[in-house]
Structures are given as C-alpha cells and as structure tokens.
Curated annotation (Swiss-Prot):
Protein origin, superkingdom: Bacteria
Role description: One of two assembly initiator proteins, it binds directly to the 5'-end of the 23S rRNA, where it nucleates assembly of the 50S subunit. One of the proteins that surrounds the polypeptide exit tunnel on the outside of the subunit.
GO cellular component terms given for this protein: ribonucleoprotein complex; ribosome
Molecular-function annotations in GO: rRNA binding; structural constituent of ribosome
Protein name, UniProt field: Large ribosomal subunit protein uL24
InterPro entries, sorted: KOW, Rib_uL2_dom2, Ribosomal_uL24, Ribosomal_uL24_CS, Ribosomal_uL24_KOW, Translation_prot_SH3-like_sf
Taxonomic lineage from the root: Bacteria, Pseudomonadati, Chlorobiota, Chlorobiia, Chlorobiales
Biological source species: Prosthecochloris aestuarii (strain DSM 271 / SK 413)
Length: 80
C-alpha cells in the first residue's frame, strides 16, 4: 500500500467506463463507482463480486449474505 504522505494520481476517475484487462473478470466492462488513489484501487460496477456476511440490523433483521463489489488494483483496468 502507498504511504499516506505521497500524492498519487490514477488514470481513471469516478464514472469512467473501463475494461478489466487482467484477473478473473478479464474482458468485463463497467463504470468506476469509487476510486481509492492512496491504495491505487478502484471499485468497478459488476466486477470482483464477493459475498459479505452482515450482522443482524434493522435493514437485515436476521442477518444476511449479500453480494457486493470489492476493489481491484487500478493497473488491471483501462479506459474503454
């Protein structure tokens, strides 16, 4: 992970359409939902979907297993 003091710049921004060029989701396209410049990672819509176990709460009274996107490294995407 990059240090907090160093400024980093990503080649993609939020709402850019990107193509995944490496990894399990290679070839998929999606919109960048969120970018983390310090960690050089981005969250792409419909890519790197994992299951997340959540505790019981008002929105999920019995708890649940939800699927959501997790970040991937910015070097694995290109603008498309």
């Amino acid at each position: 992970m990059k240090t907090a003091n160093k400024q980093t710049k990503l080649h993609v921004r939020k709402n850019d359409t990107v193509v995944v060029i490496a990894g399990n989701d290679k070839g998929k396209t999606g919109k960048v939902l969120k970018a983390y410049p310090q960690a050089c990672r981005v969250i792409v819509e419909g890519v790197n979907i994992r299951k997340r176990h959540v505790r019981p709460s008002q929105s999920h009274p019995q708890g649940a297993i939800i699927e959501r996107e997790f970040p991937i490294h910015a070097s694995n995407v290109k603008k498309g």
